[in-house]
Regions:
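Short, well-ordered beta-to-alpha junction loops that form the rim of enzyme active sites
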Residues: 62-63, 122, 175-179
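Conserved acidic residues
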Residues: 57, 115, 168-172
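Acidic, metal/cofactor-coordinating or nucleic-acid-engaging core segments within structured domains
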Residues: 88-100, 106-120
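Glycine/proline-rich loop-helix segments at beta-alpha junctions forming the active-site rim
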Residues: 127-234
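A short acidic, glycine-rich active-site loop
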Residues: 85-99, 143-155
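Short connector loops at secondary-structure junctions
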Residues: 114-134
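Histidine-anchored nucleotide/phosphate-binding helix
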Residues: 73, 80, 102-108
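Active-site and ligand/interface coordination hotspots across diverse enzymes
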Residues: 1-91, 233-234
């Protein structure tokens, strides 16, 4: 298959994210992103936040938002506590610089003819370093309400149910990687989406882990793409 580079993909797709600051009962604040909406540039509505209420062509679940950030350097994050008093499912979306891993998702979308991809994560915590991220996630497990950094927790069931709806019965793509530290979050995710069709590039490390979509070597990136597309076509 043709390997489209980031410069080409940026012309075809626009990315919008919902960024927020998770406020915990102990006063701690965590920088988060709850969703990334990848949309064909020709189909972006006049009010981008309306995208959050649309059904995408496909949903992808990855590890965490990585280095993704708002393009507007002056953007102020919403403050969230869970459970939320205002249960609106509409999210304030802003133009977003995606993490490099998302370009792999865009390549799959081009191959499949998809125009709207919704990316969720096992955790909303924004951290580009997986070791640091896993340490934070582990620490939050011991904090009252700390587990709500994951959209797959019980308190966010309605938000999750809405977010995984697709316009067609496409499988949910899974690509959060093979770090054993992810197993608790991955198991929670699989319980929450139980019964939904899924596709992944399998890992031999653990049944709930899978190959990372964007390994360092381009040959490995191509291998992941080809395998995922084969799985989706199966």
């Amino acid at each position: 298959m043709d390997f489209l580079y980031a410069a080409e993909l940026k012309k075809k797709f626009v990315c919008f994210g919902h960024f927020y600051e998770l406020v915990l009962m102990n006063g701690a604040r965590m920088k988060c992103r709850s969703v990334l909406e990848i949309v064909d540039a020709a189909l972006v509505p006049e009010t981008p936040s309306a995208i959050s209420l649309m059904k995408p062509d496909v949903v992808v679940i990855m590890m965490n938002p990585g280095s993704s950030h708002p393009k507007d350097i002056y953007h102020l994050d919403d403050e969230f506590e869970y459970p939320r008093a205002n249960g609106s499912l509409r999210k304030q979306l802003v133009l977003t610089q995606p993490d490099n891993t998302q370009y792999q998702v865009m390549r799959v979308a081009v191959s499949k003819g998809w125009n709207h991809i919704r990316v969720l994560n096992l955790s909303d915590l924004r951290d580009p370093k997986s070791g640091s991220f896993l340490q934070k996630a582990g620490e939050l497990a011991g904090v009252m309400g700390g587990h709500t950094h994951s959209i797959f927790c019980a308190e966010r069931a309605e938000e999750c149910s809405h977010s995984i709806q697709r316009s067609a019965n496409t499988p949910i793509m899974l690509g959060w990687g093979q770090d054993p530290g992810l197993i608790p979050l991955a198991e929670q995710c699989m319980r929450r989406i139980g019964g939904e069709p899924t596709r992944t590039v399998a890992s031999d490390v653990h049944p709930v882990l899978n190959a990372h979509p964007s390994p360092l070597l381009q040959a490995k990136k191509l291998q992941w793409l080809e395998t995922m597309i084969q799985e989706l076509d199966a």
